[in-house]
């Protein structure tokens, strides 16, 4: 398996070859989230980040999606193993905003990237009460729909 290191605006990420595509997993797109607050842009890192494993799923009732952690704002990228610009498919997992994870096997983008010649991006975002509970009536510092704000931050990354 060939390992690949790429330079991003935030730092170096080591990826790998997977089923004929290039893959970088577990890339942070925001700072570890503060409960019920909008995500903050990720800071630059030094050294090389390991992009060969998925980041944790966001906390939810479905225990089958372990490991889970509140520090869950990570995305995954699969690209064809060819030069040149490609269209990007940004995939937001389902789950009625209550559950789901970008690391589910059904959302592995390697085959789609290789066969359809697109770059595939999957993203974790806060779900359930951590992503969509509205406390703004108590304090304006709380933001409703943090999960949607997470998705917007991933698109900005």
Report the location of each language-model feature.
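Non-catalytic accessory segments of hydrolases
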Residues: 1-148
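Short, well-ordered amphipathic alpha-helical segments that serve as non-catalytic structural scaffolds
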Residues: 151-157
């Amino acid at each position: 398996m060939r390992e690949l290191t790429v330079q991003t605006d935030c730092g170096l990420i080591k990826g790998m070859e997977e089923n004929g595509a290039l893959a970088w997993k577990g890339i942070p797109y925001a700072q570890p989230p503060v409960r019920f607050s909008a995500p903050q842009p990720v800071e630059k890192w030094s050294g090389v980040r390991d992009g060969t494993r998925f980041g944790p799923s966001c906390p939810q009732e479905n225990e089958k999606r372990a490991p889970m952690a509140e520090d869950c704002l990570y995305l995954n990228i699969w690209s064809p193993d060819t030069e040149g610009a490609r269209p990007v498919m940004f995939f937001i997992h389902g789950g009625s905003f209550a559950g789901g994870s970008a690391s589910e096997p059904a959302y592995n983008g390697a085959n789609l990237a290789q066969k359809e010649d697109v770059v595939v991006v999957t993203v974790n975002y806060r779900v359930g009460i951590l992503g969509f509970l509205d406390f703004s009536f108590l304090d304006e510092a709380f933001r409703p729909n943090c999960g949607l704000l997470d998705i917007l931050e991933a698109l900005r990354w």
